[in-house]
């Protein structure tokens, strides 16, 4: 379908329905989302502040944790504008180009999260398998290079996404059954040949999530082998405890991702509310849970929090 200027038709705005079956503008729904955002933002800002001010946390593990916290803030802020406007102000229209920008940032931050979790697994691998070389292997320059590499890889991989979407005509309406813009939802209202989009999306998922998760599993296989060599059970438990926070963070991220991918690929007839709720889980739960997981499971973080409050009271 062509517009008046001879270019493929694209709606000026897209309408976001929020969660199908739940009316937008309801106070209790808005309150839930505000609480989720508050927990995520306050929790991740607290992690960043704690690592910055506490000298005992100036170690590779906590630098990677800071990257994770910063990325989780990016995930939260990339969805916040449309979610808040939809549920708090009952305004559910977003400009088409703004929707593409939001889609790009949501997917980019999600891919960066996967890369950071891989870097954190490598950190645990070096710490447990080569403890005497830990500081010399993971220097500040290498950590910075890893962070920039994750950013560059995610940005360049996702950069073509808005353009391969924008080339399509949109003639199936302008309604997205979501509270933010995602690539699969845009494909449902697009016309024309979407094979390029689907193939590119699948390759990107395999190249990013597939490879990252494979290397994370490989890292933990090598860690497990190293732990079995340790004679002392106390040392084994200590080594395992240093990995528990990261394992929980990996599960909180990858389990919803796998569930969403399976639903989109193999259960396309699922009610819209199922797709929306699962997408909300994978975008809202990890940024909210990660600060809690590391605060509960990491002794040094707990000590840092107590020390910070003691200083504040003094």
UniProtKB/Swiss-Prot annotation:
GO terms for molecular function: G protein-coupled receptor activity; olfactory receptor activity. Disulfide bonds join 99-191. The chain crosses the membrane at residues 28-48, 57-77, 102-122, 142-162, 199-219, 240-260, 276-296. GO terms for cellular component: membrane; plasma membrane. Residues 1-27, 78-101, 163-198, 261-275 are extracellular. InterPro entries: GPCR_Rhodpsn (IPR000276), GPCR_Rhodpsn_7TM (IPR017452), Olfact_rcpt (IPR000725), OR51/52/56-like (IPR050402). Keywords: Cell membrane, Disulfide bond, G-protein coupled receptor, Membrane, Olfaction, Receptor, Sensory transduction, Transducer, Transmembrane, Transmembrane helix. CDD domains: 7tmA_OR51-like (cd15222). SMART domains: 7TM_GPCR_Srsx. Residues 49-56, 123-141, 220-239, 297-314 are cytoplasmic. Pfam families: 7tm_4 (PF13853). It comes from the Eukaryota. It is found in: Cell membrane. One of its GO terms (biological process) is sensory perception of smell. It is a multi-pass membrane protein. Its main location: membrane. Odorant receptor. PANTHER family: OLFACTORY RECEPTOR 51I1, OLFACTORY RECEPTOR 56B1-RELATED. Belongs to the G-protein coupled receptor 1 family. This is Olfactory receptor 51I1. It comes from Homo sapiens (Human).
């Amino acid at each position: 379908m062509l517009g008046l200027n001879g270019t493929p038709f694209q709606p000026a705005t897209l309408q976001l329905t929020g969660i199908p079956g739940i009316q937008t503008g309801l106070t209790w729904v808005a309150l839930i989302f505000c609480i989720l955002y508050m927990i995520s933002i306050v929790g991740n800002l607290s992690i960043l502040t704690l690592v910055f001010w506490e000298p005992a946390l100036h170690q590779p593990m906590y630098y990677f944790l800071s990257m994770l916290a910063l990325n989780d803030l990016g995930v939260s802020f990339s969805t916040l504008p449309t979610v808040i406007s939809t549920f708090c102000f009952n305004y559910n229209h977003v400009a088409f180009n703004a929707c593409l920008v939001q889609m790009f940032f949501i997917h980019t931050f999600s891919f960066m999260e996967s890369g950071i979790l891989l870097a954190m697994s490598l950190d645990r691998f070096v710490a447990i398998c080569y403890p005497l070389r830990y500081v010399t292997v993971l220097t500040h320059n290498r950590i910075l290079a890893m962070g920039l590499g994750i950013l560059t890889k995610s940005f360049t991989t996702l950069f073509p996404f808005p353009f391969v979407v924008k080339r399509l005509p949109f003639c199936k309406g302008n309604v997205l059954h979501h509270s933010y813009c995602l690539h699969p939802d845009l494909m449902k209202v697009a016309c024309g040949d979407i094979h390029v989009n689907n193939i590119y999306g699948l390759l990107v998922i395999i190249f990013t999530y597939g490879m990252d998760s494979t290397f994370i599993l490989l890292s933990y296989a090598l860690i497990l082998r190293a732990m079995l060599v340790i004679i002392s059970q106390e040392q084994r438990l200590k080594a395992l405890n240093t990995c528990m926070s990261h394992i929980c963070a990996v599960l909180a991220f990858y389990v919803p991702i796998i569930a969403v991918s399976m639903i989109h690929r193999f259960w396309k007839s699922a009610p819209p509310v199922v797709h929306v709720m699962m997408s909300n889980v994978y975008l809202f739960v990890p940024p909210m849970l990660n600060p809690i997981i590391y605060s509960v499971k990491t002794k040094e973080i707990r000590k840092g929090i107590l020390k910070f409050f003691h200083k504040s009271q003094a």
